[in-house]
Amino acid sequence: MTEQPINTKKKNGDISKAPTPQNTPASVTNSYMRSKPPTVSTIQESNNEDGTGAAAAAGGLANNPVLLSMIQGKLGDLVGKQSGYIDNLSKPVKNRVYGLKSLQLNQMKLEAQFQKELLELEKKFFAKYQPLYVKRKQIINGELEPTVEEIEEGQQLEEEEKGIDKEDGEEEEEEEEDDEEEDEQGIPGFWLTALENLSTVSETITDRDSEVLSNLIDIRMEYLSTPGFQLIFEFKPNDFFENQTLTKTYHYQAELGYSGDFVYDHADGCEIRWKSKENNVTITIERRKQRNKTTKQTRTIEKLTPTESFFNFFDPPKPPKIKSEDDDNDDKLQDKEEANDDDEGEEGDEEDEELEARLELDYQLGEEIKDRLIPRAIDWFTGDAVDFDYPELEGEGDEDEYSDEDGEGDSDDDDDDDDEAAGSQKQPPPECKQQ
């Protein structure tokens, strides 16, 4: 019988509706915004519905692709260039700038040393976690029962977190003892439930994936000798694939990034040895019959189509190769020769954006499983980690609804604002806030 995930998810507000934090200056008393309103004069726009001037300008550029290409090229050359302010500084000031660069270089060397020592410290304590993770695996799979002391400590923690009285807890415990099943071992569906409570991962899990993931008995991690880590998914014998473990390895670059952190380089997956095409949840099979017009014989044709699946996680996308300067120059020449082929350029941009999104999601999944799921697996199973994840969402849904209503009400006054004189002055706002 297929184990089903336990529904422990708790309802939360939509995170997309969370308000954007604002940084308010400590004081705006001396701000010019308080002393007087902006003095830029306004220009009364004519009510020319035809928009003849703008349309004529746009039409002129559209009919002159050479001029349009020249303008775009000039604007593109300006991107990323400095204004020249540093070059025009006096020599003594430049020397001070060089001195600050030297100080920053020494600071970055210390940051690199800090990150390397921090990684070694993480590895040291990770080794101390291992006996606890081994015992967790044994309890989940029914190989070991927790001690009386561990049960009492866990009950006390739950009572403190949820504010349960001891007497009420004892009554609930008696009811649970009456419903106990002696044949049930371990915690069924533990890792499937924990994964489905982790929102980023749950979005990649399909119904077919759930049946496979119900055979998952452990998720663990190992550090590499080089910067990076490996995720290990262990399964009990099942009808889907022959592998006992599936691995995903993340590699970082040897050199630290500008911010002083390790920079992601690439990821390696593993080959899943599916027992049959029907059990491969990463594809869909479409079968149709064809009849030969001459011999009248029929044959069955199969079409295998890749489909969305959590198990695509073990076949990660490959980042694009870094191009050399010679390759960039060749690309520029090729771009000039193919300037009129806009459709192919747009398709290439879309493919690059899609690849970038896939790489970002793949890295995010690995980091969340490593940093959030494995250390706090029991909280993701019970759903408690969901509340710790987004505590600020509680009670903010109504505020968003009221703000939407205010926005609709303000639209009624738009016509009145348009009738005001262009030169009239308005009082400055009482406070300036920056987003």
Swiss-Prot record:
Biological source species: Candida albicans (strain SC5314 / ATCC MYA-2876)
SUPFAM superfamilies: NAP-like
Residue list for modification Phosphothreonine: 20, 24, 29, 42, 52
Residues that bear Phosphoserine: 16, 27, 31, 35, 46
GO cellular component: cellular bud neck septin collar; cellular bud tip; chromatin; Gin4 complex; hyphal septin ring; nucleus
Stretches with biased composition (Polar residues): 19-50
Gene (UniProt): NAP1
Any one GO molecular-function label of the UniProt entry: enzyme activator activity
The keyword Phosphoprotein is assigned to this record: yes
Composition bias type Basic and acidic residues, residue spans: 356-374
Compositional bias per record (Acidic residues), positions renumbered to this chain: 146-185, 338-355, 386-421
Localization annotation: Bud neck; Bud tip
Family statement: Belongs to the nucleosome assembly protein (NAP) family.
The keyword Cytoplasm belongs to this UniProt entry's keyword annotation: no
This protein's UniProt keywords: Phosphoprotein
UniProt protein name: Nucleosome assembly protein 1
Result of knocking out the encoding gene: Leads to constitutive filamentous growth and abnormalities in both septin localization and organization. Exhibits greatly reduced virulence in a mouse model of systemic candidiasis.
Superkingdom of origin: Eukaryota
A UniProt-annotated Pfam family: NAP
GO biological process, one term: hyphal growth
